[in-house]
A protein has these predicted regions:
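Generic, well-ordered alpha-helical segments
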Residues: 33-37, 54, 61-68, 110
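Residue-level detector of alpha-helix boundaries and kinks
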Residues: 27-30, 61, 103
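Short secondary-structure boundary segments
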Residues: 33, 58, 88-90
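A short, GP-enriched loop/loop-strand-helix hinge that lies immediately N-terminal to
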Residues: 53-59, 85-86
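N-terminal beta1-alpha1-beta2 module of alpha/beta enzyme domains
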Residues: 1-56
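Flexible, glycine-rich active-site loops centered on histidine and acidic residues
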Residues: 2-8, 63-115
Length: 115
């Protein structure tokens, strides 16, 4: 069985936190899109904890350009030597409209087009 855990580290402490979680025996870490970018801490985890699997759980899709997101995911996948898994989601209407300033549309059909 593999054990993954949330990776809440601020960017300035991400390298050390990734090493600490690897030493504790975690197999992987995932970031959440809260008050920080979900990708940048994973770059540092990829570099400083080469045994950890990495994931976004989740990155909000619709405020991002699909091509830009694909580049970010591909670059992180290459940099981590295949240890990255992209998790994307739609988020709720209030967050999409108020936090990100993007029009909310029914997410299922839009996500299909996005992917």
């Amino acid at each position: 069985m593999k054990i993954d855990g949330p990776f809440y580290a601020q960017l300035s402490g991400a390298a050390g936190e990734a090493r600490r979680l690897a030493q504790l025996g975690y197999d992987g870490v995932y970031t959440l899109e809260g008050s920080t970018d979900p990708f940048l801490p994973l770059v540092l985890a990829a570099e400083h904890a080469p045994g950890l699997d990495l994931a976004t759980g989740i990155a909000v899709a619709f405020p991002r350009n699909p091509l830009h997101l694909a580049y970010q995911a591909w670059d992180l996948q290459k940099f981590s030597q295949g240890r990255f898994m992209l998790g994307i989601g739609s988020q709720v209407k209030a967050h999409i409209e108020k936090r990100f300033g993007v029009e909310f549309n029914p997410p299922a059909a839009r996500m299909r087009d996005y992917i």
